[in-house]
Amino acid sequence: MIIKQSSNVLRKKRHLRLRKIIIGTITRPRLNIFRSNKFIYVQLIDDNAQNTLCSVHSKETNVIGSNIKAAQAVGTLIAQKALALGIKNIVFDRSGYLYHGKIKALAEACRQSGLQF
């Protein structure tokens, strides 16, 4: 009998493959995304110092839920915090999620707010 792996296990495998390549530094930190059923969490991470520079989650915004509007609000908020720290260039880590829907909306909101990746 063939047992199919869950989509979360497959996502974690993709994430581990990507993490071998993607490394954040102090000048170009890694934008890490975690998407739960209710909320979206985003962090800017310096992997060399193993330090989180700033973080934002959808609970901080006025938009309720984990939809595309919440992702756009989180994207603009993390971009504002990053620009306040003097960070303009980042490395985008999609954490194994497919690049569509909420992840794409968050990335485009970051780009429109002034971040480059």
From Swiss-Prot:
GO terms for biological process: translation. GO terms for cellular component: cytosolic large ribosomal subunit. The keyword GTP-binding does not apply. GO terms for molecular function: 5S rRNA binding; structural constituent of ribosome. InterPro entries: Ribosomal_uL18_bac-type, Ribosomal_uL18_bac/euk. Pfam families: Ribosomal_L18p. Keywords: Ribonucleoprotein, Ribosomal protein, RNA-binding, rRNA-binding. Belongs to the universal ribosomal protein uL18 family. Part of the 50S ribosomal subunit; part of the 5S rRNA/L5/L18/L25 subcomplex. Contacts the 5S and 23S rRNAs. This is one of the proteins that bind and probably mediate the attachment of the 5S RNA into the large ribosomal subunit, where it forms part of the central protuberance. This is Large ribosomal subunit protein uL18. The gene is rplR.
